[in-house]
Amino acid sequence: MSARTFIRAFFSTFLVSVLALATSEAKTVVVLDPGHGGKDNGARWYGVSEKTLNLDVAKRVEILLKKRGIPVVMTRRTDTYVSLGYRAQIANRHAGAVFVSIHFNAHSNRSIKGIETFYISSKGRKLAQSMQKRLAGRINTNDRGSKKHHYAVLTKTRGVAALVECGFISNHWENRRCSTSWFRDILAQEIASGIAAYCNTL
């Protein structure tokens, strides 16, 4: 092999390695946060605990994101209590991570229903709107929009963060619907789609 051929082969191999490394590093980590857990039930109406729904939907979203090749970290995988500060710490371990906290809503006025998302920063707003757009476009309920709110998990998280409220379990109709596996599948599909669409803009 001539010196010129060797040098050409070396730099070709080097370039491929650099491109592969860049592609690997470009993968955005998504941190999914199933709200509440353990001693913290969250909302509880008509025998349904929010913490259980949150974890179920988060696990479904995880599967869908991983099928798209998006790496996922969960703040909890079982019915355990995780403090708000520690949830943010988990997200902050991953530079550039996208953090999504999954919840179900409740209100003393049982007629209130709908889906809404929350954010703290301009980038978080884009993430929240991406999920809100898809959820509201697919699900027959009130579109309560994306709003800025100083939730602790959002303010303590350094990266892009949003919180999604998947429906009011205090509303009897939404409670029954959210209690079904097929509906939680739909929620997961649209949340995952919204997250993936946002990640594609990074």
List the model feature ranges, each with a label.
Residues 1-4:
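N-terminal secretory signal peptides that target proteins for export/translocation
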Residues 9-20:
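Bacterial N-terminal signal peptides
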Residues 27-29, 48, 52-202:
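Active-site-proximal helix/loop segments of hydrolytic enzymes
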Residues 21-26:
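Sec/Tat signal peptide C-region and signal peptidase I cleavage site
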Residues 28-47:
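Short glycine-rich His-centered loop
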